[in-house]
Amino acid sequence: MSHHPSGLRAGFSSTSYRRTFGPPPSLSPGAFSYSSSSRFSSSRLLGSASPSSSVRLGSFRSPRAGAGALLRLPSERLDFSMAEALNQEFLATRSNEKQELQELNDRFANFIEKVRFLEQQNAALRGELSQARGQEPARADQLCQQELRELRRELELLGRERDRVQVERDGLAEDLAALKQRLEEETRKREDAEHNLVLFRKDVDDATLSRLELERKIESLMDEIEFLKKLHEEELRDLQVSVESQQVQQVEVEATVKPELTAALRDIRAQYESIAAKNLQEAEEWYKSKYADLSDAANRNHEALRQAKQEMNESRRQIQSLTCEVDGLRGTNEALLRQLRELEEQFALEAGGYQAGAARLEEELRQLKEEMARHLREYQELLNVKMALDIEIATYRKLLEGEESRISVPVHSFASLNIKTTVPEVEPPQDSHSRKTVLIKTIETRNGEVVTESQKEQRSELDKSSAHSY
């Protein structure tokens, strides 16, 4: 018995098929699970009426064959040329089918690897999704709620601080208004004091002018007194000269009228002396009265000037103290305003920071929701891909089952047939019947593994015409 090379190819293809695919992977409940239990049987008439030619069916697990012509064996003699042509055609078809099956095996292996990878990703995404559904939202919600509570508490503290600052600001504003009112009053008093000072300066100037006028008058009166004294002295001298001359004349006249002239001269002298004394006394009294009046006026003006200077100094001291107080109040006001501005800026910055924190938390929450939605979409897309792969794998499984059912036809095992041929002896036909041997081989597979394998032979008699038609 000679073995044909196609039988080796069939065995190699079967081994390559099992080695390529192997046992299907055990996948998760939601993933693709490939389990199939296929039972197929094939029966083929493999015999002839000739006792010298026998055909035996070998093992097969090979790709589908494209030859549709049935193998016909003559009852008396095997046509080797026809078998060779069929064998060449079958080999070409088988090589093409082997290549196609190899490509299908590669694609199927790629799909299996892809399904495994997608199953791993699916399991990881399911774990992440369950964790995100079970923990992340609650934890994020707790974190957000805690952060919001802290922000609300800080906002309440800031609100109370703001109220306190506003109350303090209102009190400072009232104090500032009172200080402004006091400043206005002091400014008004200062203006009144300056006005009085101007008036006093005017009075002082008037008093100074009056004093100068009085001094000038005193000087003129002193000059007049000196002039009157000189005039009086000259008059006295003239009077003495006249008296001496009269005395000389009297001496001359005494001789004649001595008693009358003496009396007349005494009277005249007494009269002139009384007039001179009276004039001198009046001049002295007028001078003393004028001097006393001028002294009183000067004293009064000096007292008024002293009082004006004292009031001016007092007003200057008050103005200086008020100016210092106004400067201090102005500095206090500026410091309070600066502190108020700093508090407002600090409150605005803190409020902006809290608002930014709240916005950041809201953005993180939104991003978490978007990421969760994205994971859900990816999970849905993976489910869709999984369903498509399940459908495609089911389609390939059906195709493979169809191919397995087709390769179970004995024509595909033509390459594995062991043909023992002897030259038939020409004998006259004894009867019109011939025997045929039918070999039925049943193979049961599950998950790509051969579970059971059985063979059954049936022998029957047929007419020669039926055998030839086969």
Swiss-Prot record:
Disulfide bonds: none annotated. One of its GO terms (molecular function) is structural molecule activity. It is found in: Cytoplasm, Cytoskeleton; Cell projection, Axon; Perikaryon. The modification Phosphotyrosine is found at residue 470. Residues 406-470 are annotated as: Tail. It holds the Pfam family Filament. Phosphorylated; phosphorylation increases after nerve injury in regenerating neurons. Residues 263-405 are annotated as: Coil 2. Residues 97-407 form the IF rod domain. Residues 133-143 are annotated as: Linker 1. Residues 447-470 are annotated as: Disordered. The modification 3'-nitrotyrosine is found at residues 17, 379. Residues 454-470 have a biased composition (Basic and acidic residues). Forms homodimers (in vitro). Homopolymerizes into a filamentous network (in vitro). Forms heterodimers with NEFL, NEFM or NEFH (in vitro). Interacts with DST (via C-terminus). Interacts with RAB7A; the interaction is direct. Interacts with PRKCE (via phorbol-ester/DAG-type 2 domain). Class-III neuronal intermediate filament protein. May form an independent structural network without the involvement of other neurofilaments or may cooperate with the neuronal intermediate filament proteins NEFL, NEFH, NEFM and INA to form a filamentous network. Assembly of the neuronal intermediate filaments may be regulated by RAB7A. Plays a role in the development of unmyelinated sensory neurons. May be involved in axon elongation and axon regeneration after injury. Inhibits neurite extension in type II spiral ganglion neurons in the cochlea. PANTHER family: GLIAL FIBRILLARY ACIDIC PROTEIN (PTHR45652), PERIPHERIN (PTHR45652:SF14). It is linked to Amyotrophic lateral sclerosis: A neurodegenerative disorder affecting upper motor neurons in the brain and lower motor neurons in the brain stem and spinal cord, resulting in fatal paralysis. Sensory abnormalities are absent. The pathologic hallmarks of the disease include pallor of the corticospinal tract due to loss of motor neurons, presence of ubiquitin-positive inclusions within surviving motor neurons, and deposition of pathologic aggregates. The etiology of amyotrophic lateral sclerosis is likely to be multifactorial, involving both genetic and environmental factors. This is Peripherin. It comes from Homo sapiens (Human).
